[in-house]
Amino acid sequence: MLTWLEQFLIRYPELALFLVIAAGYWIGSFKIGAFSLGPVTGALFAGLVVGDFAHVPVSSMTKSFLFLLFLFGVGYSVGPQFVQAMKRDGLKPVLLAVVVCLTGLAAAIAVGRILGLDPGFAAGLMSGSLSQSAAMGTATDAVNGLAVPEAQRALYISHIAVADAVCYIFGYAGVIMWCTVVAPALLKIDLRDEALKLERSLGMSRAKPGLASAWRKFELRAYRLDEHSPLIGSTVAAAEARPEHRLFIHRIRRGERVLQAEPGTILAPGDVITISAPRQIIVELIGSRAEEVEDRELLDIPLISADVFLINAKLAGMNLQEASQQDWTHGLYLRSLSRGGQELPIAPGVVLQRGDLLRIVGPEPVVENAAKNIGVIVAPSNSIDFVVLGLAIFFGGVVGVLVSFPVGSIKIALSTSVGTLLAGLLVGHLRTLDPRFGRIPDGAISLMTSLGLAAFVGLTGIHAGPIFLSALRDSGISLLLGGMVVTLLPQIVGFCFGHFVLRMNPILLLGGLTGA
């Protein structure tokens, strides 16, 4: 049975890859406390097992194809925020990332030389220790460019996967331990308390409803005002001027007439008003203190929901509190806000950026007018602009091959990997200028990034499987100890630089360390 399975996997390597992907995601789903390998590292270990069991042939073109899809997807997803983040946040996060990355690179080079590691082991040491499995792809590109015999290159590429597998577990767990236990102890802070402080600085509230809840699901109801109502004698604008809640008066029935609620209209006893607000706000502010009226004509206000792509440069840079004070937001509700496929919390201090996707709700004329002030309405679509996708990767790869810079006596090219990543950044950024350009749905981007990297790493594991155990016996302990140094040194240096030099907020500092 095992012999048949071995021959089957060798004969049908594409099926072996799908087996590795499935096993990788299954392995990555297991958790020990807060620790889990994740699907990418799970795919690496699954690939090593399958590769050790059966010498499955691996196509280098397939590996490159998958890795380039992953890189383009990453660039595309962060492109809309990349330039804006540079403008908004300044150099602090960038400088922190540069220091951490350069320290990690220098540590990997130094440890590699001290231990006498070959290029493959050294590259895997870096990718595993820094828990950056994507570096396996660029390292493979670099190894393929070495002027050594083909057999030697194949051995080096196998060593990348071996070293990554050995170093990854501490590379992942070590950063978690540093950022959740050691660093907070050194800073003498409680992570939860600091996170709550940061939330409050952004206007978020967990204890009571505020802007976050008032800009979500809402009701449209009609109420008759009696002579004891606190709203009697006040204008519509004054009744709506509640900074802690978002409430709007749309129409007023006065006798037989239906009036549009103008800001200067004074409310009188007997008026029936239509109010839109979140359900809990209506209950808290009005509740049983007013008579609810079922007035079909008054309540017949067409409401629509629209996804609007933010391209207005004047709006970008405002926080939600400032944006909500614009004249054209009257009667408008923000149901959700997403950036790069990730939904953001709705709070007064959250700053808008070009490329954000806002789902707004309100009366049809209000939504249409707001969309003009925000950007353009994006119609739901599952179509992919394959023309832009293919040409961007092609020309990005061409630029990566042709552009080089001197380092000492040699020239180093950007490589197809870096070129493709830059192409993704460019296309993603251009979409902030015209969202109709290069459209790729979030689901497709997620597939490119998650499946692309997991499949690439799985193939690398399959390739390294036949020599994994022997390489582990020869270099396992030295790789593990060296990996610990490469994991912790960048964290320590980055922590000191961010805290003492940049004086960053503790939560942002620790977040930057995990991201860098």
Swiss-Prot record:
Membrane topology: Multi-pass membrane protein
Entry's transmembrane regions: 10-27, 32-54, 64-83, 95-117, 165-187, 386-408, 412-430, 443-465, 480-502
Single biological process term from Gene Ontology: potassium ion transport
Keyword Membrane assigned: yes
A Gene Ontology term for the protein's cellular component: plasma membrane
Cellular compartments annotated: Cell membrane
Record domain RCK C-terminal: where: 208-291, 296-376
Gene3D superfamilies cross-referenced by the UniProt entry: Regulator of K+ conductance, C-terminal domain
Key words of the record: Cell membrane, Membrane, Repeat, Transmembrane, Transmembrane helix, Transport
Pfam families cross-referenced by the UniProt entry: Asp-Al_Ex (PF06826), TrkA_C (PF02080)
GO molecular function: monoatomic cation transmembrane transporter activity
Entry annotated with the keyword 4Fe-4S: no
Family listed: Belongs to the AAE transporter (TC 2.A.81) family.
The protein, known as: Uncharacterized transporter bll3475
Species per Swiss-Prot/TrEMBL record: Bradyrhizobium diazoefficiens (strain JCM 10833 / BCRC 13528 / IAM 13628 / NBRC 14792 / USDA 110)
